[in-house]
Structure formats: C-alpha cells, structure tokens
C-alpha cells in the first residue's frame, strides 16, 4: 500500500531523492529522513488495515475515507452512511425532514480573542434567523427482519446555530444546510445504534464543526 499511487498521501512513502554531488552528511541525513517517512507510511497503512478488518471493509476504502482533522482520525460522512447501509444488519438509512417555520432570533456562544488574557473567551451573541427556516432532520431505519424503527436524535438548524456550527468561518451549514443535517443525523444514529462501525471516531464534518482552541 505504501508504494501505491492509489492511496492518499498519509499512507504513501514519498521518498526524497539524493541530489547530485551530495556529500556524505547530506546523504546520511536524507537516508535517515526517508527511513522515517517509510516507517510512518507503513505504520499508517497497518492502522488502516486493522480498522478495515474490524468493520469488515476494504483497506483501500478505509484509507480513502479516513482523514486526520486537527490531529484526530475522522470518517467521511458518506463512507459512514455507506458502511451502515452495507453492513447487512440494517435496512438503508433514511432521513425525515420537518420544516418548523422561521428560525427567529437565537442566542449562541462565540469565541473572541482577548488580548489581555491572550486567549479566546466565550461570549453570548444573538443570531438573526428571521429569514431562515428552522429545518429538523432525523435519521431512521429498521433492523433486518424487524419492524421496530430506530431513530436518531433530531438535528436542526436551531441546534446548529446554538452550538456555533452555523456561524463558524467557512461553515458549510449556510450553503449545504440539508446535506449537513443529514451527515450529522447519520453520525448521531451510528453512535446510538452501531458505534462499533465508527469505532468511536467522529466524522470530518463533526471535527470541523466542534473544534475550538480549547481542544
């Protein structure tokens, strides 16, 4: 895997070439660096193979859908949904949307830099959502051979604003609202009913939403 062009860079041993006319010290330094690069790539591949064996997936698929966000391994939301749908224990995940009307004014917590303390501090702000609809999403499905419906906790635009996800710089909640609702609802569903499939790891979107300087 570490020598393949099909795997992401985290799993690939991208070795440095020796420059022409390099002295012994330079050659020794580059060889040592290449050894470290190769060791790290192989170690990452071994972790991916171990994760793949635990969730019954292809190692290549795991490598292509597991990313490191802020130093923590995270799943692609699409891959997590596909894993639930293909595990054989559940019917495919479905999503129910409910429009709860205008969002209105919503209090939320933001973090601003305080030059006196040299750190970010939590402050309460108010979001004007009078022109935005509060949409709620629930992920649900049933176990194979059972009629009992398994539902996630509801995720809504109001929740996204209150938690600060909607207002973060670069947030996709404002441009891909329904998609983000689906991704977060699917993650909540998996954590509740099949945590072994995610192995306790958050999704890429979750990590990007909840990361603050306090973590």
Task: Report residues per predicted region.
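Polyanion-binding surfaces on beta-sheet-dominated domains and ring/shell assemblies
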Residues: 1-215
């Amino acid at each position: 895997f570490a020598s393949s062009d099909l795997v992401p860079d985290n799993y690939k041993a991208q070795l440095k070439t020796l420059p022409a006319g390099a002295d012994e010290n330079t050659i020794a330094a580059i060889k040592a660096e290449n050894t470290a690069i190769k060791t790290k790539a192989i170690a990452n591949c071994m972790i991916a193979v171990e994760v793949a064996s635990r969730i019954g997936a292809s190692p290549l698929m795991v490598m292509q859908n597991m990313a490191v966000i802020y130093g923590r391994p995270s799943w692609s939301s699409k891959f997590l949904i596909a894993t639930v749908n293909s595990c054989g224990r559940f019917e495919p995940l479905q999503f129910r949307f409910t429009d709860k009307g205008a969002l209105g004014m919503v209090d939320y917590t933001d973090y601003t830099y305080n030059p006196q303390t040299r750190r970010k501090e939590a402050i309460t702000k108010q979001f004007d959502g009078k022109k935005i609809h509060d949409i709620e999403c629930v992920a649900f499905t049933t176990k194979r051979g059972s009629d009992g419906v398994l539902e996630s906790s509801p995720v809504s635009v109001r929740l996204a604003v209150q938690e600060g996800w909607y207002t973060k710089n670069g947030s996709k909640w404002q441009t891909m609202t329904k998609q983000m609702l689906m991704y977060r609802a699917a993650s909540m569903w998996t954590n509740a009913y099949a945590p072994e499939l995610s192995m306790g790891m958050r999704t890429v979107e979750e990590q990007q939403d909840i990361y603050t300087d306090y973590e």
